[in-house]
Amino acid sequence: MIESLIALIAAIVGLGIGYLVAKKINDAKYEIFVEQAKAKAKAIEYEAELILKDAKNSILNAELEVKKKYEEKTHKIQKDFNQKFDDLSKKEQKLQQEEEKLKEDKEYLCKSQKHIQNLQSDVDKLKNKYQEKLDDVLKILEHSTGLTQNEAKEIILKKVEENSREQIAHIVRKYEEEAKNEAKRKANFIIAQATSRFAGEFAAERLINVINIKNDELKGRIIGKEGRNVKTLEMVLGVDIIIDDTPGAIIVSCFNLYRRAIATKVIELLVEDGRIQPARIEEIHEKVCKEFDSAILEEGETIVMDLGLNKIHPEIVKLIGKLKYRASYGQNALAHSLEVAHLAGIIAAECGGDENLARRAGILHDIGKALTHDFEGSHVDLGAELCKRYKEHPVVINAIYAHHGHEEATSIESAAVCAADTLSAARPGARREVLEAFLKRVSELEDIAKSKEGIKNAYAINAGREIRVIANAQLVNDDESVLLAKEIAAEIQEKMQYPGEIKVNVIRELRAVEYAK
């Protein structure tokens, strides 16, 4: 019994001790768990602080970026606003100047009207004075002569009319002279303004081009066997080729600037290539002609763009470029037309006209000169017909006619073109009359030869002392060539005046070409 009790007590004591030990262990684990939880909480809190800090930095950077963009945009808007404000201020200033000018004109008009009213008042007073005198004279006449009042009135009125007419004529002449002087003063001022705002360049056109040659061997190859190459060059190119003892130089002479420029380019390419023979000459000539056509169009487009013009037909643009190879009285036609365009624009603007339209009329006023080598007629008629065909502005057509006196100028722009044309032509050194007379004679010489049937082309060479005529071998035989030369010589002798004699050289060449396949 006692043993059982002792065992029970021991069991109870063991359970108590086990409970205490277990509780102690659990308490220790709990404390460890709590510490771990606290550590994790601190780690999470630290990580959250880092995330929050990064978020704040991102928000701050975003705010700075937005602020920077806002400031840049605000600065740009402010700059645009300032620019527009400046432009508006300039326009407002210009408007104020125009208003002041209108005000001055209005004041001048009011003064003129007042002056006219004063004159009218003076005239009325004179009329009253003459009427009083007339009444007195009528009474005297009635008593002294026994004339009726109507008869006396006729005598007096006739006398008064003669006296009044003299006085009125004197007044009219006075104000007409004042108006002319004022108009002349304003015209001189406008011309001075135009010429001071434009500074053009001028270089007189020559009749020769000099081509540099490396050595005399190349000269011999250009001449060819028995002069075959140089003859082919002169016949194909229509120029004079002068090869003398001058070292390192060949001279190309021709009054036609376009032919001379093409000839110079062809010879330069042949010298560079080294293959100089008739077939190669014709091949290079055809190639250069195509290149010049493209270059002429580009030149015209550049000029139209520089002048700020638009909607000009491509054919007219090409002819503008072709003016570069035309000359009048030694003055390059393109340089002259550009000068007229700029001056006409300035003059028209000063007179209250359309500056762009005046420039357009100025560049086209001599456009017919680009056609005179290919068509019959004056450059005025050719240019006007061309502009009518391509529906140019009526002011342009009127300017073409008016600048040579074929029509009266009907607008400010046309009058500006006429004035600019006169200014450009009258400038000292701008033109050479003697050279132009020579060029005209040489051109007439070619025209006479080309007017005959069966003629392919004609070139005046040797300073107009020889005309080389290329006949169509299929239309003209050998016998007809002789007659053709005599006819041309007779017509030249009949229609032209020239010193010495002119040689007429008719060339008939038949070529047969076939290809072996």
Curated annotation (Swiss-Prot):
Key words, A-Z: Cell membrane, Endonuclease, Hydrolase, Membrane, Nuclease, RNA-binding, Transmembrane, Transmembrane helix
One term under GO cellular component: plasma membrane
Disulfide topology: none
Record GO biological process: mRNA catabolic process
CDD domains: HDc, KH-I_RNaseY
Enzyme Commission number(s) of this protein: 3.1.-.-
Presence of keyword Transmembrane: yes
Entry keyword Oxidoreductase: no
Cellular localisation: Cell membrane
Boundaries of every KH domain copy: 207-273
Transmembrane portions of the chain: 1-21
GO molecular-function terms, A-Z: RNA binding; RNA endonuclease activity
Every HD domain range: 333-426
Record SUPFAM superfamilies: Eukaryotic type KH-domain (KH-domain type I), HD-domain/PDEase-like
Matching InterPro entries: HD/PDEase_dom (IPR003607), HD_domain (IPR006674), HDIG_dom (IPR006675), KH_dom_type_1_sf (IPR036612), Ribonuclease_Y (IPR017705), RNase_Y_N (IPR022711)
Similarity comment: Belongs to the RNase Y family.
HAMAP family according to UniProt: RNase_Y (MF_00335)
Name of the featured protein: Ribonuclease Y
Organism per entry: Campylobacter jejuni subsp. jejuni serotype O:23/36 (strain 81-176)
Gene for this chain: rny
